[in-house]
Design a protein with these regions (language model features):
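N-terminal pro-sequences and low-complexity stem/linker regions of secreted or lumenal proteins
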Residues: 34, 39-571
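Secretory targeting and sorting signals
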Residues: 2-34
């Protein structure tokens, strides 16, 4: 809804503009409650100053501006937890150009090493469907393993062992840490695997300074990290290669904005920064992580944590916050793990409902000090919404068992708390489908599928989630606004899964592992491959540059927009 049509949003716009007069910094500079000894904070995250006059300028020009290629609507579909190689590594060629996938990975890039730095001979496994019924041992001479394995030290096809139709998925709300035994009582079809750890410090250890060789050692799921899917059998691939399908661009150099998991990368999707983890009174308080000399906060089947580097601590701890800025420095070989203070990097719950009754909660983020892209769009009079599967049920107090509270990033901000005008921008996915069918999409739509449909390993089926993605795309590309709409499909983060391409170092937050990304439109002339470097904040950059909005931090200010991808498809 634009400011000119909705008096409540208009009031919020005026309030934001007035408040901006007193805001010193936005987009990532640390407030006094965050402790940091790293001077790069100031250069990496701001400040970016805003005035009321600057905030009002885009409002007058918004109606005359469009997205790259003249598109008038942007739809961002944000899926869950897969690396590029894991899903798209076997894509092949597009319009004669090669997608950078598994075929370009060298043997060294595929090889995983143990904690002592020597290569595994075999890949250890603990997903129940990769260990039983007993698979014929083909690898028995690895000194790092206590049991023989069927898997040698290289990527393997998950589909060869867990097929899309196999009953290996848990019932909704049921935890299965090591996976669901195939055809066991209560098991559902869908070819689910177990979940894999995907956290801030663990990913940095797994990346190993760009060598990409510690994914197995730094994971609770060990060798499953090397599993990949048959790309050309995925529903999304099949759909995009039908005669009637829209054309697409594969962005094969697109990385998650920040190291770690879903909570943090959802924050970077909308705000291009890491939030401060100030706790909420009368709730479980978030804790700082405590690291060993390798930068790891805990042990795993193939990793034994050492004593903490901080002499004031007695044991390592995998907390919700970054490590404390202690006087004792980390070893020189892991200086890249330099984020410290009270930054919330692992999953925490919001102060505003809906939230989980378990887990730490953090105070609402002040939009006047740290605005997000919703604030920018509202101030400019540009219509937008965040659509989430299961939102209406969750907001009424009856959240589905697979509704993920930490996938709702705007709910962590004060201006979107219950009863505020901003709350009107948070809607159920069903309303997105209805709007697309009626030709009433806002200028910018973020779409977050419900847990059972978001492709997340452990609790969701990859093929079922891909089917849901296809249905969303069909809704957009057959609707009245199809030819004026640009769709971006990407994933929040890697889900703990290996990829062979090293992330280019940018700052202390990331980027992390390479993730799948597609740019799609019904009016594209042909499909293409884009090798340009992008990360999650490129979505923000696309919006900001299209509508003349102030960047939220120096990361999105520097990021490439997706204009190049659009140009490739329309040549």
């Amino acid at each position: 809804m634009s400011v000119s049509r909705n008096p409540r949003v208009a009031a919020a716009t005026l309030a934001l503009a007035v408040a901006a007069l007193g805001a010193a910094t936005v987009g990532g500079a640390a407030p006094s409650t965050a402790t940091t000894t790293n001077a790069t904070t100031r250069t990496l995250t701001g400040p970016v100053t805003t005035t009321a006059a600057a905030a009002s300028r885009p409002t007058r020009a918004a109606a005359r501006r469009t997205l790259p290629g003249g598109y008038r609507h942007l739809v961002v579909i944000y899926q869950e937890n897969h690396s590029f190689d894991n899903l798209y590594g076997r894509w092949g060629r597009v319009h004669g150009r090669r997608v950078r996938g598994l075929g370009q990975a060298t043997r060294a890039q595929q090889t995983q090493v143990a904690q002592d730095g020597t290569p595994y001979v075999c890949l250890p496994q603990n997903d129940v469907n990769l260990t039983s019924p007993p698979l014929t041992p083909t690898c028995t001479t690895d000194p790092h393993l206590t049991e023989p394995s069927h898997f040698t030290n290289r990527p393997f096809l998950i589909d060869n062992f867990i097929k899309p139709e196999d009953k290996t998925c848990p019932p909704p709300g049921v935890s299965a840490p090591f996976g669901v035994p195939k055809n066991s009582t209560g098991a559902l079809s869908g070819g689910c695997t177990r979940d894999l750890v995907h956290r801030f410090y663990q990913e940095q250890y797994q990346l190993d300074g760009g060598r990409q060789d510690r994914y197995t050692t730094g994971s609770d799921a060990v060798g499953l990290t090397q599993g990949v899917y048959r790309t050309r059998r995925l529903p999304i691939y099949s759909y995009l290669h039908r005669r009637s399908a829209p054309k697409y661009v594969v962005a094969d150099n697109f990385f998650q904005a920040a190291f770690g998991g879903s909570f943090l990368n959802h924050q970077w999707l909308i705000a291009a920064r890491t939030p401060i983890g100030n706790g909420v009174p009368d709730a479980t308080q978030p804790t700082n992580s405590v690291l060993d000399a390798n930068g790891m906060p805990n042990s795993y089947p193939q990793y034994k944590a050492g004593p903490p580097v901080d002499p004031n601590e007695t044991t390592v701890r995998d907390g919700q916050l970054t490590r404390k800025c202690a006087a004792t420095a980390l070893p020189l070989d892991i200086q890249y793990i330099d984020a410290c203070g009270n930054w919330a990097v692992n999953t925490v719950q919001p102060e505003s409902p809906p939230f989980s009754s378990s887990g730490s909660r953090i105070a609402l983020i002040d939009d006047d000090t740290y605005p997000n892209i919703g604030d920018r769009l509202t101030a400019a009079g540009i219509s937008w919404n965040w659509y989430s599967g299961g939102w209406d049920d969750a907001e009424s107090g009856h959240a589905g068992p697979q509704f993920q509270y930490h996938h709702q990033p705007f709910n962590y901000f004060a201006d979107y708390a219950p009863g505020t005008p901003g709350r009107e921008h948070l809607k159920d996915e069903r309303r997105f489908i209805a709007a697309a069918n009626r030709g009433q999409l806002p200028t910018v739509s973020f779409v977050k599928p419900y847990g059972a449909e978001n492709e997340h390993p452990g609790y969701a089926s990859e093929p079922d989630g891909s089917d849901h993605l296809v249905n969303l795309l069909k809704t957009v590309t057959t609707g009245p606004q199809a030819r004026k709409t640009l769709v971006v499909v990407t994933y929040d983060e890697f889900g703990g899964q290996w990829d062979h391409v090293s992330p280019p170092p940018v700052d202390k937050w990331g980027p992390g592992t390479r993730i799948p990304a597609l740019v799609i439109s019904k009016s594209f002339r042909h499909s293409a491959v884009d090798h340009r470097f992008y990360d999650t904040t490129s979505i923000l950059s696309t919006i900001e540059r299209s509508y003349g909005l102030e960047p939220l931090s120096t990361r999105d200010a520097r990021s490439h927009s997706l204009a190049h991808a659009v140009a490739l498809a329309n040549r």
